[in-house]
Amino acid sequence: MTVRMYMHIKKIFFCILGFCTFASAFLSAAENGTVHESIIKAFGLFKDPNAALTSFRSLHIPYGGRCEAMGSAFTAMADDVSFFEYNPAASCVLEHTEAALFHNFWIADSAVDTAAFTRRNGNFGWGSALKSFYVPFTEYNIFGGRASKGYYSETTAAFNGSYNFLAGYTFKGIALGTNLKTSFRGVPDYSDNLTGHIISDSGLVQSGLALMADVGVLLRFNIGKLYTSRDPNFNIGFAMHNAGCSWTGFGKKVVLDDPLPTDFSAGIAYRIIENLVFTADFRQPLNMYNPKKSERWSIAAGTEVNITDFFALQAGILLKGANPKISFGSSLAWKKLSFNATYSLDLTSSLNPINKLSLAVKMDFGDEGRKVLQNRADKLYIEGIDYYTQGEFEKAIEKWKEVLVLFPRFDPAKQGITTAQNSIALRKKIRDVQKLY
C-alpha cells in the first residue's frame, strides 16, 4: 500500500467516523422530538398560508443523491445529470456523457424513482429523464375489510436541449436551455360505499395530465480563484420551472386542474479552493392562476468537500415555510461509476419529522474525445510559442491557425497571431529603415 493511498484511507475513515457520530446524535434527537420542536419554534414565523395550493406536488420532490444532499441549492452548480430539476441550461457545459439511476424513499411507503441521461455534442447539450413518484393506496370499507388497492402515482417525462453561446477560452459563454415536460397523475379506482363494488373509471376522473416547460440560464467565470484550473470557479444560474397547465376529469368533463408548482430560482456556486464549494439558491413560487396566492419564497444553501479525488461529503439546508429540510450525504467514485447516499430530515411536507433516504448511481461514459482534442490544441499552441521565441513568426502563426481550426474561439491563439503579425510588421519596418542607411 502506497503512502498516498494510506493517507486517503485515513482521511475517509475519520470522515466516516465523524459523519456516523453526528448522524447518530442527530437521529436520536429527532426521534425524541427535540430537534423537531426546536425547529418549529425557531421558524414558526415563516408559516405560509398559501402552501399546498398547487397540483402535481411531486414536481417539488428532488431526484435525490448529491444535489439533495447539498440542500437542493443546485441552480448554479448543476454539474452533473441531476441538472434536469434545477437548471436546464447545464447540459451544454457538462464534460462527460452521463446516465444515472436515483431511488429516493421515505422511511414509510412513498418513493421516487428516476432514470436520467445526458450527452453533449460540441456546444449543444441534450438529454432525457423519467421520474415516477408512487405510494401504495388501500381502501377499506365500513366493516374494515379491504375494498380496493393500487398505487397513487405521478410520472414525469422531461426532454432537454441547451446551447452554450459565444463559448471560448476566456469567456466561457452564455448557456441557455429548456426542458419540455409532461406529467400524468394516476389515481386507482375506488369502491362504492354502499355496495362495495369497484366504480369503473372512478380513478380516471381524478387523474390528471400536465404539460409544462423549464427555462434556464447559466454563466460561469472566475472570481477570487485560489487554485490553478481551466474550469471557472464561480457560477450564476437562473431558471423558471414548471410553467404550464394541467387538466383533470377524464372520462367525464375535462377541466383545468389546480395550478402547477411554478417557480423562479436564482443561485450561485463558489469554489473557493479546488476541494471546497459553497452553493446558495433563492426560489420564488408563482401561482399562475392567481399570483396573489403564490407561496412564499424559499432559500437553500449547501456545501461539498472533496476529501480525496474519489470520496466527497455534502451537507445542506432548505428553508421553505416554517419547516426546513436538513440533509447530508457522501459520494464514492469507482472507475466509471459514482455512488451517493443521502439522508434528509424532511419537514417541508409534513408536520411530523420525515426521515428520507436516497441512493444514486451514476455512470460516466467519457467525454467523447474532447480532452484529447484539447490536449492536441494545447500542444499546437505551445509549439507556436516555441517558434515565436525563436523568431520564426510565420511558423508560429501556422501552428496557432491549426489551433483555431480545432477551437475557433481559443483566445490565446488569436492573441498570439496578432502579436506575431505585429512582430513581422515591426521587423519589416526595422529592415526598411536599415536599407536607408
Named regions from a protein language model:
Residues 15-24:
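Bacterial N-terminal signal peptides
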Residues 82-91:
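N-terminal periplasmic accessory domains that precede
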Residues 30-68, 111-112, 116, 120-405, ...:
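Outer-membrane beta-barrel porins/channels
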Residues 72-74, 97-108:
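Short strand-turn segments of transmembrane beta-barrel domains in outer membranes
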Residues 25-29:
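Sec/Tat signal peptide C-region and signal peptidase I cleavage site
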Residues 2-16:
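Bacterial N-terminal signal peptides that target proteins for export
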